[in-house]
């Protein structure tokens, strides 16, 4: 099969940059179209780190022109903005991987936590892009909703125990994320002086990723107590999960059996860390049980498994390729 022409809408941010870096090295995807809402810049002007490696003009989005050049498009744009692109792209016959929240949730839940949904027809047909659960559906999908970063780390840690029905709500998820998770746009919250040598929770118990965790685990929103924290590192995410369990079972064995065929989940006998997954699509998971309390630790790269490399894995499956094709698997260490 010849290379597949793909495009990226939303090239300005960190997830757009990570997508471009992966696609430039991908043996079967040819990056043919790079756009954002304004256009008028070169890629190296937006991302100086790419200077000398790859150059192109970043154009203003033109759906007709995009449809002539590409078979698949990645949307690395904010929620609500994605809805404006998905409908015409699908109508033009393109496949879409959407990295926003626009197609992850049911209409009612989405509108409760985000805004009115203007593309319910495609929402009903979107496939949640978690290959460990939905690989076969992703292969047939025209539209894949890439999971959020926090939900990815929480859901992958909890799934095996919810599946075996040994775990009971409430679920407590305490997550730490690097500053890149807040995006590229400047703010007082992510200002160096505020972040450096500091640690703080934000939007505790009401963060918009909590209903995504709940919906995909099949529990009520009120049963998931999720608190994210910003830590002074560039990239990475570590979720500490606490849940009550019952019955006589080996937690490590349940985890290992559930993920025995998973290509991007590594079950660890030792506590996991962010550094060991930086720059990769891996999710590393550790579990420890004390009496009726189960502790689960889950580590991902928020920009990779939590966004861009996960999106390329989904695109691989949609186009009939092996999910590992072109996906970085060696961490940024040291």
From Swiss-Prot:
The lineage of its organism: Bacteria, Pseudomonadati, Campylobacterota, Epsilonproteobacteria, Campylobacterales. Its EC number is 1.2.1.38. Pathway: Amino-acid biosynthesis; L-arginine biosynthesis; N(2)-acetyl-L-ornithine from L-glutamate: step 3/4. HAMAP family: ArgC_type1. The keyword Methyltransferase does not apply. The active site is at residue 149. Coiled coil: none annotated. Keywords: Amino-acid biosynthesis, Arginine biosynthesis, Cytoplasm, NADP, Oxidoreductase. InterPro entries: AGPR_AS, AGPR_type-1, NAD(P)-bd_dom_sf, NAGSA_dehydrogenase, Semialdehyde_DH_NAD-bd. Belongs to the NAGSA dehydrogenase family. Type 1 subfamily. It is found in: Cytoplasm. One of its GO terms (molecular function) is NADP+ binding. One of its GO terms (cellular component) is cytoplasm. It comes from the Bacteria. One of its GO terms (biological process) is L-arginine biosynthetic process. SMART domains: Semialdhyde_dh (SM00859). Its main location: cytoplasm. This is N-acetyl-gamma-glutamyl-phosphate reductase. It comes from Sulfurimonas denitrificans (strain ATCC 33889 / DSM 1251) (Thiomicrospira denitrificans (strain ATCC 33889 / DSM 1251)). It catalyses: N-acetyl-L-glutamate 5-semialdehyde + phosphate + NADP(+) = N-acetyl-L-glutamyl 5-phosphate + NADPH + H(+). Pfam families: Semialdhyde_dh (PF01118), Semialdhyde_dhC_1 (PF22698). Catalyzes the NADPH-dependent reduction of N-acetyl-5-glutamyl phosphate to yield N-acetyl-L-glutamate 5-semialdehyde.
